Amino acid sequence: MKLGGIDEAGRGPVVGPLVIAAVVIDESKIEKFEALGVKDSKKLSPKKREELFEKIIELVDDYFILELSPEDIDKREGTMNDFEVENFAKVLNSLKIKPDLVYIDAADVNEERFGIVVREKLSFYPKIIAEHKADSKYIPVAAASILAKVTRDKAIERLKEIYGNIGSGYPSDPITRKFLEEYYKEHGSFPPVVRRSWKTLKKIEEKLQKEKNQSNLLNFLKKS
């Protein structure tokens, strides 16, 4: 039996791409992946993920990786869940070898619903198991999570070569917020690598505008 796994990396960040990866693994190879130490990418060091990336590529029967830019995300119609459903299906349909069973790391609060709507968009008819934290339960999803995470990490490293230290790209990262604020102060706009539909940017704009207004008021009072 051919087992499929699909996962994403970079759903929440304000900077950089969303990466979706899928793999197909023959059931007979699962033990080889376990022996390699393949597990949820979040539980592995960056170095270990990179080592496993190449080994996974060699061992899987098939794989497909889709990198979606901030522009792709901003142009979406509907919610992020709708966007992920559409692109999860796109990635699975792009596999040359179709799995008989697909494990999905569900992005919806309703796991079953997420699996159903993905299945409706597939060009083939596998059994679907959609669950939260599937990357920590099923080897095919763990392998896909590593491919997605390493691909996104490499994209972030390329951005750091251009823009300097941008942090992890997550809105909660102080380094990322500092980068966005300083870039906006210098250029009057945000860089092309950010998701303009994220509320984070509006909050930063409002904060900087407030600071500017306060500064202008202080200067006015000093002169008067």
UniProtKB/Swiss-Prot annotation:
Cell compartments where the protein resides: Cytoplasm
InterPro entries xrefs: RNase_H2_suA, RNase_HII/HIII, RNase_HII/HIII_dom, RNase_HII_arc, RNase_HII_hlx-loop-hlx_cap_dom, RNaseH-like_sf, RNaseH_sf
Keyword Manganese belongs to the record: yes
Cofactor: Mn(2+); Mg(2+)
Signal peptide, first to last residue: none
Native species: Thermococcus sibiricus (strain DSM 12597 / MM 739)
Gene3D superfamilies, per database record: Ribonuclease H-like superfamily/Ribonuclease H, Ribonuclease hii. Domain 2
Gene name of the record: rnhB
Entry function: Endonuclease that specifically degrades the RNA of RNA-DNA hybrids.
Name of the featured protein: Ribonuclease HII
Keyword list, A-Z: Cytoplasm, Endonuclease, Hydrolase, Manganese, Metal-binding, Nuclease
HAMAP family named in the record: RNase_HII_A
GO annotations of cellular component type: cytoplasm; ribonuclease H2 complex
Pfam families in UniProt: RNase_HII
CDD domains: RNase_HII_archaea_like
Molecular-function annotations in GO: manganese ion binding; RNA binding; RNA-DNA hybrid ribonuclease activity
PROSITE patterns (UniProt xref): RNASE_H_2 (PS51975)
Cofactor binding, note field: Manganese or magnesium. Binds 1 divalent metal ion per monomer in the absence of substrate. May bind a second metal ion after substrate binding.
